[in-house]
Amino acid sequence: MAAGGAVAAAPECRLLPYALHKWSSFSSTYLPENILVDKPNDQSSRWSSESNYPPQYLILKLERPAIVQNITFGKYEKTHVCNLKKFKVFGGMNEENMTELLSSGLKNDYNKETFTLKHKIDEQMFPCRFIKIVPLLSWGPSFNFSIWYVELSGIDDPDIVQPCLNWYSKYREQEAIRLCLKHFRQHNYTEAFESLQKKTKIALEHPMLTDIHDKLVLKGDFDACEELIEKAVNDGLFNQYISQQEYKPRWSQIIPKSTKGDGEDNRPGMRGGHQMVIDVQTETVYLFGGWDGTQDLADFWAYSVKENQWTCISRDTEKENGPSARSCHKMCIDIQRRQIYTLGRYLDSSVRNSKSLKSDFYRYDIDTNTWMLLSEDTAADGGPKLVFDHQMCMDSEKHMIYTFGGRILTCNGSVDDSRASEPQFSGLFAFNCQCQTWKLLREDSCNAGPEDIQSRIGHCMLFHSKNRCLYVFGGQRSKTYLNDFFSYDVDSDHVDIISDGTKKDSGMVPMTGFTQRATIDPELNEIHVLSGLSKDKEKREENVRNSFWIYDIVRNSWSCVYKNDQAAKDNPTKSLQEEEPCPRFAHQLVYDELHKVHYLFGGNPGKSCSPKMRLDDFWSLKLCRPSKDYLLRHCKYLIRKHRFEEKAQMDPLSALKYLQNDLYITVDHSDPEETKEFQLLASALFKSGSDFTALGFSDVDHTYAQRTQLFDTLVNFFPDSMTPPKGNLVDLITL
């Protein structure tokens, strides 16, 4: 008997031999075959296109069909203007029919780059015989394209590839039949539809959608159709659609409950450079320290979300064996053990000496309300020197703390006087909370090696508790604003560069030079970034605005959820302050990933007329997608709108009554757009049948065509696995 517990070994990924099959052009001695050999020190060992006019391409033919998993590009030993800044890769079993496998770009350096190619459809691997590389843009504007070396890797074991090839052929045939079925049904060719389905036994869609089509398109039973849609929503079938919709931000200012008459002493005052953490289990926000414009603070507060109330835990933590007054420090919370850690601070050059420059490290126990000094000087214990504007993350599972970056404070001269001494930045450290020991994981490095990381200040660092990676991006190093983005796997000690910041994705990623506050949602695999005001006076513009960005970790893509309408000064009657927080820096943002709410407090609004001004406003931010209830109401509206239009043709009086009652209740009358659309519907009562535009289906009656159009709209809310194919048969006809 075979070993029951044995796991099948993963198929081996190996280099795939190929030959040059076709090319668009080449110039002089820069032949396509040159990409078969890797000679980084030979400037002539490359393919170069004759021009940069599209389409330029190379088609590679594999020795035999294979699952092509990766493509590697070799380069010249120096940067080169002809390197590919943007390119696409396509693949397929024949050169006439290819699928896009990759859209990316190369860095303009000498390092080889490997990219993963799309090689699965619905989790099933598919084979390719041909690979087409299409250059789109070179690093030097208007230069010809050059490719120095190409390597393909994947699986070409016939025992694995052949079943994939069989599946792929069957899949293509099945999709072709489904396109025919869709076409026949749209045109009401009932006999042809039924005959093809009976013969092939291939389903066009999930039975539930067939049921909806039957009730809606064939029978016009709108009530039954609504019931089926309601069942679909309640069964969670619209969840996938909801997860793909863009967020809309909803800010609301929090006005905490006041217990005393004066109302001043029972909430934190104005400040910037403070720190906040949140206990998501108890829904409590903890706030400590900061700078009020004239002095550092040592007060410690807790805000209960449930009670909507601030409680002052301590007016001065130093008096309770805790940290002294400070700002630009960092805090992190261990929710499992209910403990808060704080490290670092900013010290003015006038008060710096060998004693004050020691980096103390404290832990606060929430349940016993006590502070404990873990270290008088972390540098003496193998940890970081005294730093400010660093970042700190907690790994509760392994009981570890990670701290990275920050400016090291020194005795000599002012921090701003770069001539007195080159600024020093702190590396990446790990603190084992159990053993109370520090370990240096990465020193600050300016080298561009694959495992090197560059220290910085004012950056973002987040810990993903599920994939166990730190994510680091942005920040500043001396006068340079950084926009690279990398992850660090804490278990394998490996750095992965997500973006080196050289690609000009202007407008597609958060801008550098602005204060960024970031949070992470490990469950949704999302990083959230609030971009505010620049600390740099020269960079501060009058029309500065907040923007909120979301990075999708799985899709490796940024999206901007909103940029505020800088409306306060353009429209004095509308105060921006009432709707959302004004742009600022030195503020704090925390995220409750359990209840999906952000909390923001205080900061510096950067008013040159009042440089000491600090804020004490408190806000919550919810990122909202369409709810199930909204989608159900919207679907009912679409169905009833269509029903009304049908009635309007037959019985205008009955239609008017239907409009005023049944259709009216599916509209949100507080929404101006919905209200306007609803008001325009009445015009249907005065249209003749010929006024309606059909789908262009000359062979089906108007009602059938309109109902089919409504059905196609409703289908969009269902998961792709349930729906008919997205394309149309007629679209395959080329002129």
Swiss-Prot record:
Which intervals hold domain LisH?
Answer: 172-204
Enumerate the spans annotated as CTLH domain: 206-258
What is the protein's known function?
Component of the CTLH E3 ubiquitin-protein ligase complex that selectively accepts ubiquitin from UBE2H and mediates ubiquitination and subsequent proteasomal degradation of the transcription factor HBP1. Required for internalization of the GABA receptor GABRA1 from the cell membrane via endosomes and subsequent GABRA1 degradation. Acts as a mediator of cell spreading and cytoskeletal responses to the extracellular matrix component THBS1.
Q: What is known of its domains?
A: The LisH mediates head to tail dimerization.
Q: Please report the residue spans annotated as repeat (Kelch).
A: 284-330, 339-391, 408-458, 469-515, 526-578, 597-651
State a single Gene Ontology molecular function.
protein homodimerization activity
**GO biological process entries:** actin cytoskeleton organization; cell-matrix adhesion; neurotransmitter receptor transport postsynaptic membrane to endosome; regulation of cell shape; regulation of receptor internalization; vesicle-mediated transport in synapse
**Annotated PANTHER family:** MUSKELIN
Source organism (scientific name):
Pongo abelii (Sumatran orangutan)
Record carries keyword Nucleotidyltransferase: no
Q: Which residues carry this modification: N-acetylalanine?
A: 2
- Which terms are listed as keywords in the entry? Acetylation, Cell projection, Cytoplasm, Kelch repeat, Nucleus, Repeat, Synapse
| Pfam families linked to this entry | Beta-prop_ATRN-LZTR1 (PF24981), Kelch_3 (PF13415), Muskelin_N (PF06588)
What's this protein's name?
Answer: Muskelin
> Where is coiled-coil annotated?
none
Acetylation in keyword set: yes
Q: Which SMART domains match?
A: LisH
